[in-house]
């Protein structure tokens, strides 16, 4: 745990008592603050009280007594409307911050030279974050991994010289971190997502940009320039005097890092030098993973990791669950079917990465639809032998696929998985792929994408003749 001493002797309100909120309560109390905890969920209030915290309805308390409101990232700060706690805090002149802000203040106060790597982007954050941590551990670094990827940042070990924190950050977390100042900041990409919480894509992109704009003096901003928002951000941040590493998998850069399916290259003016090979690494298959690997490579090279250790670490990286996870193979008379769990693909842009990585696809898609549908995936339709549509999006997706891709409305994973497996086995293809890449949120049928992917894995492993990869 990281004790938060910056509010010692003061009263702090914490709203939202899930994993990061409860961790904030513990860290603030350990640092000497008085914590008043609140949540709309009564069970979480009870849990906090049992853990020894004062719980109260913050509506009934004088807000001028609070030094800060620590807000969980899931609570609206601005859109579609500020949460009532935010309005109360603003009326009383109380700052509204999140758990990563508490970390940044502790690091600045106690270990300002301790390396801190922060990663954001619409897609690829978790894989890139996990890969950076893996590479640094391979290099022998004392590495703490957390943030949006799982472990609450304040539950990690405290910053100190020689210890690096590798932290995935969502746009919600960045919004609550005004002092964000990583040693290395990474902005992978920006595509339309979370507009319900940010109002416009321009505001969403501006929030993402703050992570790389805030890199501390002498640090490195690594920015994907394959979208217009990244290109503009790189130019602005470079003009502000920061060290910018431009990253691309679509075209050349003058200074920066590029990648394709085979290798990662460092570019310095007219000179391009290979720093690592990617060919044959199954956990980093696809051009989207080449981008993730390029970002991770740029980060660890900036911290002093050698190309030799980088290559070893890339080859030993196991990948992440629910992100193009190869969960099994089924050997048939005519071919071998590969089953791939890409449940994390909760929008069309993410699903495009998986569809581009395979041929002869038996595609399981659908769930709670997002704006834009799947028309943007039309260039990949020739790769799809048949689609199996589930959830609320089934009828909408069927209308898009009509006359272009054979489909059936399966409604559930329980129906889709055996149907896709049967059709793949009977297709006569040498290497058919049953791919769960939903292009939708999971909330119509599952609490989160992890449970959706876990259910897919269970259904696949229950099929006759399926062996683990």
Swiss-Prot record:
Q: Could you say which residues bind ATP here?
A: 121-127
Q: What is its EC number?
A: 6.3.2.9
**Is Cytoplasm one of the keywords?**
yes
What residue range is the signal peptide? Answer: none
Top-level EC class: ligase
Q: Which reaction does it catalyse?
A: UDP-N-acetyl-alpha-D-muramoyl-L-alanine + D-glutamate + ATP = UDP-N-acetyl-alpha-D-muramoyl-L-alanyl-D-glutamate + ADP + phosphate + H(+)
Q: In which pathway does it act?
A: Cell wall biogenesis; peptidoglycan biosynthesis
Any one biological process term the GO annotation gives: cell wall organization
MF terms per GO, please?
ATP binding; tetrahydrofolylpolyglutamate synthase activity; UDP-N-acetylmuramoylalanine-D-glutamate ligase activity
What coarse category fits the chief subcellular location reported for this protein? cytoplasm
Keywords, sorted A to Z: ATP-binding, Cell cycle, Cell division, Cell shape, Cell wall biogenesis/degradation, Cytoplasm, Ligase, Nucleotide-binding, Peptidoglycan synthesis
Its GO CC terms are: cytoplasm
Compartments, as annotated in UniProt = Cytoplasm
Family statement drawn from the similarity comment of this UniProt entry: Belongs to the MurCDEF family.
Role of this protein: Cell wall formation. Catalyzes the addition of glutamate to the nucleotide precursor UDP-N-acetylmuramoyl-L-alanine (UMA).
Query: Can you say what this protein is called?
Result: UDP-N-acetylmuramoylalanine--D-glutamate ligase
Organism lineage string: Bacteria, Pseudomonadati, Pseudomonadota, Alphaproteobacteria, Hyphomicrobiales
